[in-house]
Regions:
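Low-complexity intrinsically disordered segments
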Residues: 36-111
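Broad, structure-driven detector of short, well-ordered beta-strand segments within folded domains
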Residues: 20-24
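A short acidic-Thr-Gly-centered motif at the start of a beta-strand
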Residues: 1-6
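An extracellular/secretory-lumen and virion-surface interaction module
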Residues: 16, 26-28, 34-35
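A short beta-strand micro-motif
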Residues: 10-15
Length: 111
């Protein structure tokens, strides 16, 4: 039951090539949609979303970080601009558990 409650604070932003797992406005993991592999060292991981960007032809409009299909995520540090978001959903249990396994397999840094 605890894992289900914890999962609710996460959102999965799906783009053409990647899935961005967000905890609030912080990216905690990026998964390649083709291979299903989590990239914990992706440029967006640990970054806060600065804004969302919506392209309308030549015009670009920025708006606050609210889940919107059709807009792109913009991470200022890096910078990283994703392709358009195709879907936003709560990660299912398998996705969340797969991400946790990827995190848990990382070597612990020496202090």
């Amino acid at each position: 039951m605890r894992r289900d409650r914890e999962r609710r604070i996460y959102k999965l932003f799906v783009t053409r090539n990647s899935e961005y797992l967000m905890r609030g406005d912080v990216c905690v993991g990026v998964r390649d949609r083709r291979s299903g592999t989590w990239s914990i060292d992706h440029e967006a991981v640990t970054q806060v979303v600065a804004t969302m960007v919506h392209r309308q032809g030549e015009r670009v409009r920025m708006h606050s970080f609210t889940p919107r299909v059709g807009s792109a995520l913009y991470f200022a540090r890096g910078p990283v601009l994703t392709s358009s978001v195709r879907a936003v959903r709560r990660p299912d249990r398998a996705t969340y558990d797969d991400w946790r396994r990827a995190i848990d397999s990382l070597p612990v840094a020496a202090e």
